[in-house]
């Protein structure tokens, strides 16, 4: 009986592994997408029809904002009945305190949903709406001081504007727009606004906008409609807009929601995104739980905390191809199969992914367990045995009629601290069938690896000593977090890994009484020949024979390059109960700045986009203005990246942890500037480097992180001690790096790369031409005109002088007596003299 059960179990496991493997081929017949397709392509735009803004209400008790809505271009039966009005202050106002009157005119009754940010409570606000319309307030405190009244507004822009002026004296803003689901209005007054509001067509202002979503044509197919443990969706975008010459990076939003309002939807998702243009994929998920992994060759970002209902990880893969056939083959070859859907859109900047609830997944386990194996974890699913085993065997086997072997996991501590969450009465306490959420531990799973973990309200920082790897025989390693794009930085002594609390695969759970435990894992991997799959557990691509049953090769014999090792770490945070004055950030009286220059004189900083040629010099000046003379700063990190997001690291590093990494870095010694204000001064640091053509793109970004340091021996605010770059290359430890991360400021400067040959001023070689090229000096226009005018005046004066000489010498020669009988030689001489004297002015000028 026992033998039959063991054979049945092995057959069951083998069938599960076989059915989970990649399909031998993928068939996908493209057709225009319809409403049933899971992915929809849209174009999001922000515009208004007409409008104006003014500062006419600055001396009056309230602001007046007028919204005149027009009917949208919709078919019969599709009239929109709800509008969300987003209100927040203009950029020059932090918290808005002034009373406001809103005139909300619409061609049909509407429900206005109000969403506000940075508007003070307790301030009078009046909403005048068309007949039949209502206003719903999202905040109860806001509604206490707000009133709503129905009015019969006049028709037409000018009539409505004149009505508002007659009623309130002046108007702050007037906006005409078609009915939209989302309208964004920024309240506040600015001196730069004109004195009166004069309505103009194509009114363009970031303060008054409406959002419109227009469906765009796309093609796609549903490859696999069967319920799967994970869904794989491939989206290919040809261009983010209709302008083929646009070089700016565009945000492409992926909006993930359930297709219908289910009680709860849990999914494992993989998104493979492809666009040849420079785009930034922004992933947002709502009302869906589970794991989401995003793969793209472009920049990947996630929405705000309220827009991330799933556990999100990302992987930037440069080897993702284009076209339908190659993308499907790439997904199959990399283990992302079966593919659920494929979608290609010529033009779009937004995609909606709607998920069906075709599979129930438990909250506690993101990785679902096949129903056939549920009996191994749930003893209640087994039939009651007539003669159950008793004694030690029953305790060891959990009531099963056969022994189940222990499955070791590489780098796990004994005692089962790193296990799946179990039912109250687990069958086999040591069983390890599938990866799951790990219990937080200070450090798990690596032998003799010394690390330290720090965390604050924004990020976690892990420092791992390099010597501990070398002592354990691990040379030449690559360290990442669960998200493989979050790679370790290095200095002379440590690997440094940084993770935001909501990124890089970091998870969290509540701990008593009011704390939060954040945990992640360090993935230790030898330099691979290709990119890994990047799943958080590192066990996605299990080959046949890796199931851990007897007969397999011992995991201790497997080379490190074939199986990554995980080191789990965690950090606990609790809210500060008694904040003291010493905990105030030292940056409250500090101002940072960074400028780029074209020469080492550092005279006039470059404005706008900085143009740099290949192998040309870039001169950088960073400065800090502070009141504390013992406060210093350092250039912690500088790198060049094709992405504007400073969190996206790049291999082109100029400075790392104060230490220069590029051999062309040269530092300069600027003078300290003292201000007339007592105890105020500005410290500057200057350096230059030679720009190398590493990236094949014309728009790059110089990212620099500045950090505060102290010149004192003891610092109450726990700032790191200021060190020189040469010293930082050898003596920087984990505690100093952690302290620097707490008070850093990031600057981003765009660089426009000029792709042409530029003569590099360097030392000449023997092969170079010893004859220097001729140098042509040019003059400006005014100088040339001055020289020409002076030459004209000189020529005129010279001509007049010659005429004067001619007129006087000609008269005297004509009055001379002629001898009556001169010799023949004298006659010819006299005739020749007379002929010469009676020449033209030009010939006289030539003779002279």
Swiss-Prot record:
Pfam families for this protein: Zona_pellucida, ZP-N
Cystine pairings recorded for this chain: 52-197, 638-704, 659-729, 709-722
Topology Extracellular: residue spans: 21-784
Residue stretches spanning the membrane: 785-806
Signal peptide segment: 1-20
Membrane protein topology class: Single-pass type I membrane protein
Entry-listed glycosylation sites: 34, 141, 491, 529, 533, 544, 570, 589, 696
Post-translational modification: Extensively modified by glycosaminoglycan groups (GAG).
Record-linked Gene3D superfamilies: Zona pellucida, ZP-C domain (2.60.40.4100), Zona pellucida, ZP-N domain (2.60.40.3210)
Biased composition regions of type Basic and acidic residues, renumbered to the chain: 411-425
Alphabetized UniProt keyword annotations: Cell membrane, Disulfide bond, Extracellular matrix, Glycoprotein, Membrane, Phosphoprotein, Proteoglycan, Receptor, Secreted, Signal, Transmembrane, Transmembrane helix
GO molecular function: coreceptor activity; glycosaminoglycan binding; heparin binding; transforming growth factor beta binding; transforming growth factor beta receptor activity; transforming growth factor beta receptor activity, type III; transforming growth factor beta receptor binding; type II transforming growth factor beta receptor binding
PANTHER family from the UniProt entry: ENDOGLIN/TGF-BETA RECEPTOR TYPE III (PTHR14002), TRANSFORMING GROWTH FACTOR BETA RECEPTOR TYPE 3 (PTHR14002:SF7)
Function: Cell surface receptor that regulates diverse cellular processes including cell proliferation, differentiation, migration, and apoptosis. Initiates BMP, inhibin, and TGF-beta signaling pathways by interacting with different ligands including TGFB1, BMP2, BMP5, BMP7 or GDF5. Alternatively, acts as a cell surface coreceptor for BMP ligands, serving to enhance ligand binding by differentially regulating BMPR1A/ALK3 and BMPR1B/ALK6 receptor trafficking. Promotes epithelial cell adhesion, focal adhesion formation and integrin signaling during epithelial cell spreading on fibronectin.
Name listed for the protein in its UniProt record: Transforming growth factor beta receptor type 3
Record organism: Sus scrofa (Pig)
């Amino acid at each position: 009986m026992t033998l039959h059960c063991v054979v049945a179990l092995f057959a069951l496991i083998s069938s599960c592994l076989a059915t989970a493997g990649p399909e031998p081929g993928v068939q996908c017949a493209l057709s225009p997408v319809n409403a049933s397709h899971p992915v929809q392509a849209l174009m999001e735009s922000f515009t208004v029809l007409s409008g104006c803004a003014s500062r006419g209400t600055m001396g009056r008790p309230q602001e007046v904002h007028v919204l005149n809505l027009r009917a949208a271009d919709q078919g019969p039966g599709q009239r929109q009945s709800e509008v969300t009005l987003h209100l927040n202050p203009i950029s020059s106002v932090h918290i808005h305190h002034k009373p406001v009157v809103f005139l909300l005119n619409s061609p049909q009754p509407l429900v206005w949903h109000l969403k506000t940010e940075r508007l003070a409570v307790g301030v009078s606000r009046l909403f005048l709406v068309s007949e039949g319309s209502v206003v719903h307030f999202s905040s109860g405190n806001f509604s206490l001081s707000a009133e709503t009244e129905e009015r019969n507004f006049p028709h037409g822009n000018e009539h409505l504007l004149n009505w508002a002026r007659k009623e309130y004296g002046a108007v702050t803003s007037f906006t005409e727009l078609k009915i939209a689901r989302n309208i964004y209005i920024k309240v506040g007054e600015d001196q730069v606004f004109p004195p009166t509001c004069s309505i103009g067509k194509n009114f363009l202002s970031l303060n008054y906008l409406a959002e419109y979503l227009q469906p765009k044509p796309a093609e796609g197919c549903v490859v696999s409609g069967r319920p799967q443990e994970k869904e794989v969706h491939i989206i290919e975008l040809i261009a983010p807009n209709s302008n083929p010459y646009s070089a700016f990076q565009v945000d492409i939003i992926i909006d993930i929601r359930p297709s219908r309002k289910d009680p709860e939807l849990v999914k494992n998702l993989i998104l493979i995104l492809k666009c040849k243009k420079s785009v930034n994929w922004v992933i947002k998920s709502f009302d869906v739980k589970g794991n989401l992994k995003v793969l793209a060759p472009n920049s990947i970002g996630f929405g705000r905390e309220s827009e991330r209902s799933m556990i999100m990880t990302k992987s930037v893969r440069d080897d993702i191809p284009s076209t339908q056939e190659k993308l499907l083959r790439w997904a199959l070859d990399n283990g992302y199969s079966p593919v659920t859907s494929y979608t290609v859109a010529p033009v779009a900047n937004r995609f909606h992914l709607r998920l069906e609830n075709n599979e129930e997944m438990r909250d506690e386990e993101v990785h679902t367990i096949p129903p056939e194996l549920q009996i191994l974890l749930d003893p209640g699913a087994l039939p009651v045995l007539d003669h159950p085993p008793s004694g030690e065997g029953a305790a060891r086997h959990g009531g099963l009629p056969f022994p189940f072997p222990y499955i070791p996991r590489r780098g796990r501590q004994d005692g089962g601290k790193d296990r799946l969450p179990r039912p109250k009465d687990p069958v086999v306490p040591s069983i390890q069938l599938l990866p799951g959420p790990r219990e937080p531990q200070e450090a798990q799973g690596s032998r003799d690896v010394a690390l330290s973990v720090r965390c604050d309200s924004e990020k976690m920082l892990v420092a791992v000593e390099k010597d501990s790897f070398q002592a354990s025989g691990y040379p030449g390693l690559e360290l990442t977090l669960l998200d493989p794009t979050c790679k370790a930085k290095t200095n002379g002594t440590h690997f440094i890994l940084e993770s935001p609390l909501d990124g890089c695969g970091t998870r969290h759970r509540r701990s008593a009484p009011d704390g939060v435990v954040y945990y992640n894992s360090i993935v230790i991997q030898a330099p691979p020949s290709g990119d890994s799959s990047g799943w958080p557990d590192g066990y996605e691509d299990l080959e046949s024979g890796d199931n851990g049953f007897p007969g397999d090769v011992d995991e201790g014999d497997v080379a490190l390059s074939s199986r990554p090792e995980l080191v789990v770490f965690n950090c606990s945070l609790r809210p500060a109960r008694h904040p003291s004055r010493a905990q105030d950030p030292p940056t409250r009286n500090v101002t940072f700045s960074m400028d780029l220059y074209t020469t080492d004189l550092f005279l006039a900083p470059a404005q706008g986009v900085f143009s740099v040629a290949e192998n040309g010099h870039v001169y950088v000046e960073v400065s800090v203005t502070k009141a504390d003379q013992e406060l210093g700063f350092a250039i912690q990190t500088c790198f060049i990246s094709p992405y504007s997001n400073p969190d996206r690291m790049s291999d082109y590093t100029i400075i790392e942890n104060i230490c220069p990494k590029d051999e062309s870095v040269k530092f300069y010694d600027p003078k300290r500037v003292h201000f007339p204000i007592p105890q105020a001064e500005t410290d500057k640091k200057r350096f230059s480097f030679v720009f190398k053509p590493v990236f094949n793109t014309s728009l790059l970004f110089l990212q620099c992180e500045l950090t505060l340091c102290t010149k004192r021996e003891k610092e109450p605010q726990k700032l790191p001690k200021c060190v020189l770059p040469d010293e930082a290359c050898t003596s920087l430890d984990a505690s100093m790096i952690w302290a620097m991360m707490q008070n850093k400021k990031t600057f981003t400067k765009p660089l426009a790369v000029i792709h042409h040959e530029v003569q590099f001023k360097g030392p000449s070689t023997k092969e170079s031409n010893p004859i220097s090229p001729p140098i042509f000096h040019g003059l400006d226009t005014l100088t040339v005109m001055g020289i020409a005018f002076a030459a004209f005046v000189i020529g005129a004066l010279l001509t007049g002088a010659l005429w004067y000489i001619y007129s006087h010498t000609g008269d005297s020669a004509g009055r001379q007596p002629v001898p009556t009988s001169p010799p023949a030689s004298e006659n010819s001489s006299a005739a020749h003299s007379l002929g010469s004297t009676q020449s033209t002015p030009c010939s006289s000028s030539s003779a002279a």
